[in-house]
């Protein structure tokens, strides 16, 4: 769910969108569908109520290393590409594309453009997709965005992708700028993103992230069962809900814990980075 800078409520946004986008074909270039459900996932689930969505799994931001994690991901990508387009949820179809994750070379970009276009168009033909609306969350998809017969191209930016660890920042930045200039609309989720993207496209708007109100308000319902390991913690509880990755400001979390020593600071979510400094703080859980 979301709130806009115009003061429109999230309920009216959903109603308006479902009314405008009915019976349409939608492309979505994002992270892997099997990964954690992010804002893109929730948005496409809403749109899939009245439309069909072809979700194109992640096109890599960076060249893989010889690490165990990267090799495992590469093998999983190869195996997934051998499977046909599947429908994990009603009206949501998932394609596992193959591409060479190296964007500094013009030759590689040209190869990816042709190969990815062929893969996506083949999936579109099999599903009978026509005049799609293309929601691009992954700037690496710039290599084919706008070349798929789209009626509208939308770049939906929720992160400063060029600052991710291990990314070929300059090459990805070039792809992103080209994508923004070609897009009919650029949507950003934060003020800082608006400041950095609006110069590349006059049709840039800010739509901040929101939450599923009905889901989270259950925390105030006395009938909601609190897990035992949380129930026994000292009150109040200061919660962090989400992925704990290397872009999370650990210093701020540590300062919050130090400023409220009587409270319990609870981090709920998958951890993919070193949190040993936080683990040494007594009231961080």
List PLM regions with ranges.
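N-terminal subdomain of nucleotide-sugar transferases
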Residues: 2-77, 258-260
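Nucleotide-sugar donor-binding and catalytic loop/hinge architecture
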Residues: 17-21, 220-237
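Membrane-proximal helix-turn-helix segments that form the acceptor-binding/catalytic region
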Residues: 43, 118-125, 146, 168-186
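A short beta-strand/loop micro-motif in the catalytic core of glycosyltransferases
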Residues: 54, 182-190, 205, 239
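A short, histidine- and acid-enriched strand-loop-helix "catalytic/donor-clamping" loop
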Residues: 142-143, 157-169
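Carbohydrate-associated surface elements
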Residues: 192, 207-222
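Conserved donor-binding/catalytic core segment of Leloir-type glycosyltransferases
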Residues: 229-248, 254, 265-268
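Nucleotide-activated donor-binding/catalytic signature segment of Leloir-type glycosyltransferases, i.e.
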Residues: 274-285
